[in-house]
Amino acid sequence: MRFITPLANALLCLASVGSIAQELPTANPESVGLSSEGLAQVTQNLQAHVDAGHIAGVVAAVLKDGKLVYLESLGQRDLESASPMSDDALFRVYSMTRPVTSLAAMILWEEGHFQLDDPISKYLPEFASQRVFSDPSTPDMAQTRARVGDIKVADLMRHTSGLGSRSSSIYVEQGVRLRSLTLEQVVSNAARVPLFSDPGTRFGYGLSATILGRLIEVWSGQTLDSVFAERVFAPLEMQDTVFYVDPERQKRLATVYRPDADGQLRPHEMEDIPFTQQVPLLEGGVGLVSSTLDFAKFSQL
């Protein structure tokens, strides 16, 4: 399944850098060893994707040596209203929430709150007796075996915990992860469903970062969003990176599009509750909204 979002942080313009970029030092591309001509080609290539209907719009930035040398917004933030893309547009960054979670965790590690090889059951005892599906290809709650080894904190960071994906059929059936639940409830639900593999034996892209987010709350004694705001976003001056898009920011939120069978972009919502509504679930694996320049600051670390 392919989802089209207008965020192009992977390009971290020959266009002039406007007032929004004043928070970051700017420079001429050639002064940091880049090519103005080459960046102009980047603009042409991105515009070609917009013109072909592959994406609705894009905001692209290039930074080198801590200096912003390119910033370009192309296409539209919302096709239905024909709202143009802007440099300060906000995007649902989905799984790019995960590196923020890992950074917050490592800040707490530096302060001595935990060790990377600690079993997570030391802090979340509900995981102490978790078992493993006998056949992970056809998970059955009645067909399980004893687990070999414990989930370590490091397993959560490298996605080797054995936990499943929020979209796995058994997690959906068991109601493991719903945005109407609290993070503590989701973690409790995940602990009662068997693992898909023994910890540390297999890479699996699933709820690991969500569990890590709960550990951050346990270690810090704060909510996850408070830790993010105080320990990550404030020091980096990431003023537009949030879990909830308030009314003032909503006018800048880009619509997510997915191509239909004919390749036409259609609005698509992956979540049952939109980001413009406050929800109980704030998790480490998904959920942040950010701007290109905010995430460019994070990417400079």
Where are these regions (language model features)?
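Bacterial N-terminal signal peptides that target proteins for export
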Residues: M1-A10
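Short, conserved catalytic-motif segment at the N-terminal edge
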Residues: A27-F91, H113-Q115, V132-P136, I273
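Short, conserved phosphate/pyrophosphate- and ester-handling motifs at nucleotide-, phospho-/glycolipid
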Residues: S35, R98, S291
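Active-site SXXK
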Residues: A40-Q47, A60, G66, F91-I120, ...
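Alpha-helix C-terminal capping/helix-coil junction sites
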Residues: V50, W109-E110, A191, F228
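Short, surface-exposed loop or secondary-structure junction motifs
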Residues: K122-L301
